[in-house]
Amino acid sequence: MIISTEELTPQEIVERLDKYIIGQNKAKRSMAIAIRNRYRRQKLEEELKEEVIPKNILMIGPTGVGKTEIARRLAKLIKAPFIKIEVTKFTEVGYVGRNVESMVKDLVAESIQLVEEEKHEEVSKQARKQAENRIIDLLLSEKKSSSKGEQETDLRTRRREIKEQLFKGLLEDEYVTVKLEKEPAQDDNLMGEQFEEMGVNFKELFGKILPKESEHKKMTVKEARKVLTRQEADKLINKDQVNQEAIERAENYGIIFLDEFDKIAASSGKQSGGQDVSREGVQRDILPIVEGSTVNTRYGRVKTDHIMFIGAGAFHDSKPADLIPELQGRFPIRVELDSLTKDDFYRILTEPSNALLEQYKALLRTEEVKVNFTEDAIEELANMCEYVNENTEDIGARRLHTILETLLEELSFYAPEMKGQEVEINSNYVKDQLQDIVTEKDSSRFIL
């Protein structure tokens, strides 16, 4: 189920986001308020509820400062369906490229998967029990006695013995033959978007008409348990109920993140002719979806009136005012994200629960190599990251990944031969590995 936003105040949402994302408090606050407003809307009377539309958000800031991560983490927090779409992939209707309605179909597909996983979790105990009964039957058939009389006499005893051994984990490496169903072969070109737009689910239709193919596969009991539990869970859940719940969740809680949003705005002060006409065409195609319309999908009709849209872009060559007025009005909340400083980089390296340094240390620990970063080493890394971003292209926190990969390349290569060793990385080590590359502009441009 969705985490009740009644339990999460805007302040609590920001606090949870702080565990993973450094800084950008204004963006976090705006997102937290938008999520809380969804809860407030659900408490309104039905007539007024339909009138309250979500306030879509426009995030403005360079790459790598946390635009996508804030939205993704928030969606994960409340278990809302979330998709990230690059709007540059869309073209005007009638041209080669993705139709803008495909974003809604992708959101519903994501919602279906989310709800299915939750339903599987709800029936997991029962499904596992039924799967283990099937495994016992398979083990009995694999080891059945050649004597029919003996089989009938000892069947219960042998079944009890196998059950005890199975629960003790003694049969995990035994092999059983499992029947797997395969979907009938279908040509996706014959079942394209034009049929989906009419609300026709050809995959489901052909699945009912054509006989399902099956194959028998030999696998260990451990592998079979996963496969059979999934099969049993599928039998226990109601697909129609899943579809209905998923559509409702997509409609009321779905988040569509429109990346590269600045790329469909006309360039400020530049005359690019036909290109600007094409960009405006994409904006006008997106507009009805953002304003609220009904899209036919293979799972049913989906209303977009209360889906939250987040437009995000750097807006270097254009500005929000270059979007068509109607679309500007649909993104009333504007949030500017700050470029990251050396202090931000230092905090990113050390504070989050999934901090980068902890990730690299954990990876090398699998080779039994213990790595320690001194305080001055972390400060030096933060300084270098800021310097390279200022002197080449500002890619925000993504720069840390390239710098750390370069720093630890030699250590990662020789780690299997260094079992049991402890390595201390200090500022001198950082300078030895990176100083020449950082100060040489051509090298830093291509390597970092």
UniProtKB/Swiss-Prot annotation:
Gene Ontology process terms (BP): protein unfolding; proteolysis involved in protein catabolic process
Function description: ATPase subunit of a proteasome-like degradation complex; this subunit has chaperone activity. The binding of ATP and its subsequent hydrolysis by HslU are essential for unfolding of protein substrates subsequently hydrolyzed by HslV. HslU recognizes the N-terminal part of its protein substrates and unfolds these before they are guided to HslV for hydrolysis.
PANTHER family given in the database record: ATP-DEPENDENT CLP PROTEASE ATP-BINDING SUBUNIT CLPX-LIKE, MITOCHONDRIAL-RELATED (PTHR48102), ATP-DEPENDENT PROTEASE ATPASE SUBUNIT HSLU (PTHR48102:SF3)
One Pfam family in the UniProt entry: AAA_2
CC annotations in GO: HslUV protease complex
Protein name (database record): ATP-dependent protease ATPase subunit HslU
Subcellular localization, as worded in the UniProt entry: Cytoplasm
Molecular functions per Gene Ontology: ATP binding; ATP hydrolysis activity; peptidase activity; proteasome-activating activity
Source organism, top-level taxon: Bacteria
InterPro entries tied to this protein: AAA+_ATPase, ATP-dep_Clp_protease_ClpX, ATPase_AAA_core, Clp_ATPase_C, HslU, P-loop_NTPase
Primary location class: cytoplasm
Lineage: Bacteria, Bacillati, Bacillota, Clostridia, Natranaerobiales
Residues that bind ATP: I22, G64, V65, G66, K67, T68, E69, D259, E326, R398
Organism field: Natranaerobius thermophilus (strain ATCC BAA-1301 / DSM 18059 / JW/NM-WN-LF)
Family, similarity comment: Belongs to the ClpX chaperone family. HslU subfamily.
Subunit structure of this chain's protein: A double ring-shaped homohexamer of HslV is capped on each side by a ring-shaped HslU homohexamer. The assembly of the HslU/HslV complex is dependent on binding of ATP.
